[in-house]
């Protein structure tokens, strides 16, 4: 049996509308409760149904109501989520969070503004760390965003397809980099890279995917020896026109990455 607290924001809204429609059809409160339990395996009390029908209860009093309809900002957040960001549940406080830790202040500013745009109130902090570079943290509390991002990635892809430039910018801001001859992005998730490749193709950006590190390959990270748990993939953009189209249509939010991209274009123009 599913509890109301386990439902997403949109699922609760849909359920409220369904409850009200049943009431208009002259179902009793008890009948509505039983019908929802049988049809949807959702446990909802008679008293809650009464409050909903009389508009005397707001189920979002303790939940930030945010705009999860497709938008450039939400698409960007999804791209960032597939890269550097993570979501987690803090059991002590019973709160759900979206968080990202990065070295670039301009990056966290864009993430912060995107979170604000969809209705959240994120916080930014600067944390000094002994074992790695000091980093900026941006964090926002939202059960609705947590549940939204916890969906199958195919559902998130639907938003990304509506705003491909923003999704790709978020993903490349997180995982992308520029070398002397290419733009590249690395990730364990081959399906995610293939999806990104298709989006790039629609923007006239040719890219290729290959294995950057095979499973089991040894790596030294800050003095610690690690082994790749799975094949690690790289998506690369080499062709001059594709690099140019990427710069025009996607680019980076991060200044240092934009500057490297400009240098790559200047180098390509000389040859």
From Swiss-Prot:
Pfam families: LAGLIDADG_3 (PF14528)
Residue intervals of the DOD-type homing endonuclease domain: 77-205
One Gene Ontology term of the molecular function aspect: endonuclease activity
Superkingdom of source: Archaea
InterPro entries the record matches: Homing_endonucl (IPR027434), Intein_endonuc_central (IPR004042), LAGLIDADG_dom (IPR004860)
Protein name per the record: Uncharacterized protein MJ0398
